[in-house]
């Protein structure tokens, strides 16, 4: 009997005689039910009733971030296996959770609730402006701004807030509208190209002056902004001032009609030349719209072009009453004659010089020159005289050619043969007259040179004969 009651009514003994809650079992202190008295049995019965009351109870609904129970908010305890539904706070949405809590038999709440901030729609791009913000979730704020030259029309901020069952931006998105300048300023004696009442940012206009006036300053101004949004014209407009030409000043020239102390646009004068000069250009000139005279003439001494020279050139300088021309020669040529000629009263005075080629001094060994100089000019002749005991091989007279070389070639002075060797030069037998082999060799060399000279002379004569015919 005692064993049966122990199996049916009593839980397992608790260690150290204390009451414990351990999942689905409760234990309290007693040794056996075989020997119980009345008070002891009452105590055991009360404890069993208390165990039934405590086991499986959950406390108030748990506090979950951004969520609240859908019902039974004020209850403080719930039976085991109780299920409570939760709802997300406004501005938050459920994820993949079941959105409920469950009271487990152990008296603990099992939570399956998750709420996250909802997203407002992406604001996208703002034409001609900027959208700044870190997130677009519930509670966040974005700011709007415009590029330079544009004005923000609408609110500069918008917040993601609750709207009905969802979230939306608190303010409509603004626009960036281009700024416009008013009419450009007018100018005296001129006008601008604008025809509108208002001109958008970066739009420009140009100014022109009336006839007889010229523009001072930049002809262009544009619509711009200060502080990024205040429209202003970029600069002050130009001005138009009356066109004035200075007195025409022409060397050797004079105004014969139309003289004024001040000349304005389209005024004209007639000019003439003095001192025997001739007018080159138009006699009548006009004050132009740019403040300059139309092509000014010149008064020149009416000489033809100075004569050109071969292998040389000239430079000219015009003075008050005379024109001077200076001649110079190319490299390798020397000026022969006066280097300067002049034009006065339409006539050249003096003869143009010549540029003649330069030949270097001929080098002749064992001989002398008829005229010794470091350089010789074209067509200049030189005669060569061989020293005593030397015979000339070549032409005695040579001339400086236009190419700067001597013609014919510079001759040579060779040592004459002795009396004993003269028969060798005439072609006679030599061995009976020559004392030794050295003299024989020299005689043969001299004879060879003589033949070469004679051959050269024959060729020259032949060429001259050919040129003559």
From Swiss-Prot:
<feature type="glycosylation site" description="N-linked (GlcNAc...) asparagine">
    <location>
        <position position="227"/>
    </location>
</feature>
<dbReference type="InterPro" id="IPR040514">
    <property type="entry name" value="C4bp_oligo"/>
</dbReference>
<feature type="disulfide bond">
    <location>
        <begin position="329"/>
        <end position="355"/>
    </location>
</feature>
<feature type="glycosylation site" description="N-linked (GlcNAc...) asparagine">
    <location>
        <position position="275"/>
    </location>
</feature>
<feature type="glycosylation site" description="N-linked (GlcNAc...) asparagine">
    <location>
        <position position="74"/>
    </location>
</feature>
<dbReference type="GO" id="GO:0006958">
    <property type="term" value="P:complement activation, classical pathway"/>
</dbReference>
<feature type="domain" description="Sushi 5">
    <location>
        <begin position="302"/>
        <end position="357"/>
    </location>
</feature>
<dbReference type="InterPro" id="IPR000436">
    <property type="entry name" value="Sushi_SCR_CCP_dom"/>
</dbReference>
<dbReference type="Pfam" id="PF00084">
    <property type="entry name" value="Sushi"/>
</dbReference>
<keyword id="KW-0768">Sushi</keyword>
<feature type="disulfide bond">
    <location>
        <begin position="386"/>
        <end position="413"/>
    </location>
</feature>
<feature type="disulfide bond">
    <location>
        <begin position="146"/>
        <end position="176"/>
    </location>
</feature>
<keyword id="KW-1015">Disulfide bond</keyword>
<feature type="domain" description="Sushi 4">
    <location>
        <begin position="243"/>
        <end position="301"/>
    </location>
</feature>
<dbReference type="InterPro" id="IPR035976">
    <property type="entry name" value="Sushi/SCR/CCP_sf"/>
</dbReference>
<feature type="disulfide bond">
    <location>
        <begin position="273"/>
        <end position="299"/>
    </location>
</feature>
<dbReference type="Pfam" id="PF18453">
    <property type="entry name" value="C4bp_oligo"/>
</dbReference>
<feature type="disulfide bond">
    <location>
        <begin position="209"/>
        <end position="240"/>
    </location>
</feature>
<feature type="glycosylation site" description="N-linked (GlcNAc...) asparagine">
    <location>
        <position position="428"/>
    </location>
</feature>
<dbReference type="GO" id="GO:0045087">
    <property type="term" value="P:innate immune response"/>
</dbReference>
<comment type="subunit">
    <text>Homoheptamer; not covalently linked. Mouse lacks the beta chain of C4BP.</text>
</comment>
<feature type="disulfide bond">
    <location>
        <begin position="359"/>
        <end position="400"/>
    </location>
</feature>
<keyword id="KW-0391">Immunity</keyword>
<feature type="glycosylation site" description="N-linked (GlcNAc...) asparagine">
    <location>
        <position position="292"/>
    </location>
</feature>
<feature type="glycosylation site" description="N-linked (GlcNAc...) asparagine">
    <location>
        <position position="381"/>
    </location>
</feature>
<feature type="domain" description="Sushi 6">
    <location>
        <begin position="358"/>
        <end position="415"/>
    </location>
</feature>
<keyword id="KW-0399">Innate immunity</keyword>
<feature type="domain" description="Sushi 2">
    <location>
        <begin position="118"/>
        <end position="178"/>
    </location>
</feature>
<feature type="disulfide bond">
    <location>
        <begin position="120"/>
        <end position="160"/>
    </location>
</feature>
<feature type="signal peptide">
    <location>
        <begin position="1"/>
        <end position="56"/>
    </location>
</feature>
<feature type="disulfide bond">
    <location>
        <begin position="245"/>
        <end position="287"/>
    </location>
</feature>
<feature type="disulfide bond">
    <location>
        <begin position="58"/>
        <end position="103"/>
    </location>
</feature>
<keyword id="KW-0325">Glycoprotein</keyword>
<comment type="function">
    <text>Controls the classical pathway of complement activation. It binds as a cofactor to C3b/C4b inactivator (C3bINA), which then hydrolyzes the complement fragment C4b. It also accelerates the degradation of the C4bC2a complex (C3 convertase) by dissociating the complement fragment C2a. Alpha chain binds C4b. It also interacts with serum amyloid P component.</text>
</comment>
<keyword id="KW-0180">Complement pathway</keyword>
<keyword id="KW-0964">Secreted</keyword>
<feature type="domain" description="Sushi 1">
    <location>
        <begin position="57"/>
        <end position="117"/>
    </location>
</feature>
<dbReference type="GO" id="GO:0005576">
    <property type="term" value="C:extracellular region"/>
</dbReference>
<feature type="disulfide bond">
    <location>
        <begin position="303"/>
        <end position="343"/>
    </location>
</feature>
<keyword id="KW-0732">Signal</keyword>
<feature type="disulfide bond">
    <location>
        <begin position="181"/>
        <end position="223"/>
    </location>
</feature>
<feature type="glycosylation site" description="N-linked (GlcNAc...) asparagine">
    <location>
        <position position="366"/>
    </location>
</feature>
């Amino acid at each position: 009997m005692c064993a049966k009651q122990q199996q049916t009514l009593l839980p397992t003994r608790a260690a150290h005689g204390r009451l414990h809650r351990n999942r689905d079992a409760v234990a309290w202190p007693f040794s056996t039910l075989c020997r119980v008295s009345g008070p002891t049995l009452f105590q055991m019965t009360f404890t069993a009733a208390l165990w039934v009351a405590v086991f499986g109870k959950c406390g108030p609904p748990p506090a979950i971030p951004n969520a609240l129970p859908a019902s039974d908010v004020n209850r403080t305890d719930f039976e085991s296996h109780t299920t409570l539904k939760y709802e997300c706070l406004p501005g938050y949405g459920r994820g993949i959770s079941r959105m409920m809590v469950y009271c487990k038999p152990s008296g603990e709440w099992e939570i399956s609730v998750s709420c996250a901030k909802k997203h407002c729609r992406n604001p996208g791009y703002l034409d001609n402006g900027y959208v700044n913000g870190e997130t677009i979730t519930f509670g966040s704020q974005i700011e709007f701004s415009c590029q330079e030259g544009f004005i923000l029309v609408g609110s500069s901020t918008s917040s993601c807030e609750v709207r009905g069952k969802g979230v939306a931006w608190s303010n409509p998105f603004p626009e960036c509208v281009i700024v416009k300048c008013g009419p450009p300023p007018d100018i005296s004696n001129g006008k601008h190209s604008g025809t509108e009442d208002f001109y958008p940012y970066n739009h420009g206009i140009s100014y022109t002056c009336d006839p007889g006036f010229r523009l001072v300053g930049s002809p262009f101004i544009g619509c711009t902004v200060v502080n990024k949004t205040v429209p202003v014209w970029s600069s002050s407009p130009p001005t138009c001032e009356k066109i004035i030409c200075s007195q025409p000043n022409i060397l050797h020239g004079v105004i014969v009609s139309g003289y004024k102390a001040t000349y304005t646009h389209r005024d004209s004068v007639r000019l003439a030349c003095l001192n025997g000069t001739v007018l080159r250009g138009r006699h009548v000139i006009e004050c132009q719209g740019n403040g300059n005279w139309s092509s000014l003439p010149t008064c020149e001494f009416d000489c033809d072009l100075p004569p050109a020279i071969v292998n040389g050139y000239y430079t000219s300088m015009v003075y008050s009453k005379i024109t001077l021309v200076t001649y110079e020669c190319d490299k390798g040529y020397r000026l022969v004659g006066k280097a300067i000629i002049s034009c006065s009263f339409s006539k050249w005075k003096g003869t143009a010089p010549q540029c003649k080629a330069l030949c270097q001094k001929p080098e002749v060994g064992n001989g002398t020159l008829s005229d010794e100089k470091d350089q010789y000019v074209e067509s200049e002749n030189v005669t060569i005289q061989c020293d005593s005991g030397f015979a000339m091989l070549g032409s005695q007279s040579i001339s400086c050619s236009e190419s700067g070389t001597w013609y014919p070639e510079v001759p040579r002075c060779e040592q004459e043969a002795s009396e004993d060797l003269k028969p060798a030069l005439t072609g006679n037998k030599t061995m009976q007259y020559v004392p030794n082999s050295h003299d024989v060799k020299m005689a043969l060399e001299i004879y060879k040179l003589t033949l070469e000279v004679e051959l050269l002379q024959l060729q020259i004569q032949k060429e001259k004969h050919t040129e003559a015919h």
